Amino acid sequence: MALNLQDKQAIVAEVNEAAKGALSAVVADSRGVTVEKMTELRKSAREAGVTMRVVRNTLLRRAVEGTEFECLTDTFTGPTLIAFSNEHPGAAARLFTEFAKTNKEFELKGAAFEGKVQNVEFLATLPTYEEAIARLMGTMKEAAAGKLVRTFAALRDKLQEAA
């Protein structure tokens, strides 16, 4: 279906707004994926706070112009599905990576974070805020426990020397 100029401008404006508010973006090719599977992916994306859109490449190039996702323009070939992570930088990458494991036709093209092209796997493995805090607390707890053990060992050694 042919789009008139107003429709094209609306699409560019909508994608540009999504890009400006996003933390990261992931680009994929969804050729060969069934409508049922794509519907499931869209539902999962909404739940994860990810904005997804299939956009013509020329419109997508205009939409990301001047944003930190302009570095992805080389990946805009063929049918392009773009997802913007709004809440966590790794949300879209994690969602697409999991989806690609079960759908061999789904091809990940690239990702961007903080104005640079990134590996999709790198973004997918970024810990969430809660996971990062848990890791930090675990490290701090281990350090404190280790210091306590070393203190008791030093005290034991000192008492053995005195005896």
Swiss-Prot record:
One Gene Ontology cellular component annotation held by this UniProt entry: large ribosomal subunit
Short name of one Pfam family: Ribosomal_L10
Assigned protein family: Belongs to the universal ribosomal protein uL10 family.
Q: How does it assemble?
A: Part of the ribosomal stalk of the 50S ribosomal subunit. The N-terminus interacts with L11 and the large rRNA to form the base of the stalk. The C-terminus forms an elongated spine to which L12 dimers bind in a sequential fashion forming a multimeric L10(L12)X complex.
What keywords were assigned to this record? Ribonucleoprotein, Ribosomal protein, RNA-binding, rRNA-binding
One Gene Ontology term of the biological-process aspect is: translation
* Gene Ontology MF terms in the entry: large ribosomal subunit rRNA binding; structural constituent of ribosome
Which CDD domains does the UniProt record give?
Ribosomal_L10
The protein's matches in InterPro entries, at most eight in alphabetical order, are given as: Ribosomal_uL10 (IPR001790), Ribosomal_uL10-like_sf (IPR043141), Ribosomal_uL10_bac (IPR022973), Ribosomal_uL10_bac_type (IPR047865), Ribosomal_uL10_CS_bac (IPR002363)
Please indicate if the UniProt record lists Ion transport as a keyword: no
Report the function annotation for this chain. Answer: Forms part of the ribosomal stalk, playing a central role in the interaction of the ribosome with GTP-bound translation factors.
Superkingdom classification of source: Bacteria
What protein does this entry describe? Large ribosomal subunit protein uL10
* Statement: the UniProt record of this protein carries the keyword Ligase: no
